[in-house]
């Protein structure tokens, strides 16, 4: 089966890489999406941000751990895992066409046309993460696919468990796009979050939600934040 590079066609920008970490592939029938944890310069068009092989290894391991954890705990909230090739570091997922953001023409205005109750579904997924003690910072709309009207969450390379040691923003900056960084730093200043010092995962989750205010309706962001605020483990 033939696989091609998978891009998002962003208005005003054209074809853009689907994420900053791995190389995204999709078959011509658009039924299989592949996360290839390989630093492909052609795909990333020379804008590779995760160039350290050790860091790529860590992202691959984190994806494996938390995606498979979700497969056990909430299989209805992720795409079906068709295959995991540990040698080539590829994860093959069953999908029904392009990702949620792409189907919405890369605009929040198209979300309801693609999935009328997208907000409720996304909040359910976030609630499940909170219930499981997870903090997932890859929240871009392209981190979801749609299957029979149901959202499916992907990109667990940027997910942490409450049981792990704290991290600092500087440790994960390579995962954050330059556009996102422009929103991140003012939010950090407003929230009193350090760039250098390890921070509580709860605070980093709140920071993450704030950095996505331009990608989602404001009321959605507030509801997402409230999930972690009211979670019993906080």
Task: Explain the meaning of each model-derived region.
Residues 56, 71, 78-118:
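Conserved structural core of kinase catalytic domains
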Residues 147-234:
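C-lobe/activation-segment region of protein kinase-like
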Residues 24, 93-95, 145-146:
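Conserved hydrophobic "DFG−1" position in protein kinase catalytic cores
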Residues 32, 77, 91, 152-153:
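Protein kinase-like catalytic core scaffold
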Residues 8, 12-64, 68:
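ATP-binding glycine-rich loop module of kinase domains
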Residues 122-130:
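Short C-lobe core helix of eukaryotic-like protein kinase catalytic domains
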Residues 129-146:
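Catalytic-loop of the protein kinase fold
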């Amino acid at each position: 089966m033939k696989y091609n590079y998978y891009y998002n066609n962003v208005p005003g920008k054209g074809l853009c890489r689907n994420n900053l970490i791995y190389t995204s592939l999709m078959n011509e029938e658009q039924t299989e999406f592949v996360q290839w944890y390989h630093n492909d310069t052609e795909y990333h068009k020379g804008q590779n941000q995760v160039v350290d092989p050790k860091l790529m290894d860590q992202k691959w391991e984190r994806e494996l751990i938390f995606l498979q954890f979700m497969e056990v705990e909430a299989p209805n909230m992720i795409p079906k895992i068709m295959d995991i090739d540990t040698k080539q570091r590829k994860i093959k997922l069953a999908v029904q066409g392009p990702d949620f953001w792409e189907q919405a023409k890369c605009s929040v205005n198209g979300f309801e046309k693609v999935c009328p109750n997208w907000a409720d579904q996304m909040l359910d997924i976030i609630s499940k993460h909170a219930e499981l003690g997870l903090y997932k910072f890859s929240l871009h709309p392209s981190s979801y696919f749609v299957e029979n009207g149901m959202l499916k969450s992907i990109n667990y390379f940027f997910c942490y468990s409450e049981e792990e040691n704290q991290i600092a923003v500087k440790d994960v900056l390579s995962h954050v796009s330059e556009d996102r960084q422009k929103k991140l730093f003012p939010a950090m200043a407003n929230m009193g979050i350090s760039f250098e010092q390890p921070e509580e995962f709860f605070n980093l989750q709140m920071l993450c939600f704030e950095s996505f205010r331009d990608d989602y309706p404001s009321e959605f962001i507030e509801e997402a934040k409230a999930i972690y605020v009211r979670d019993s483990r906080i």
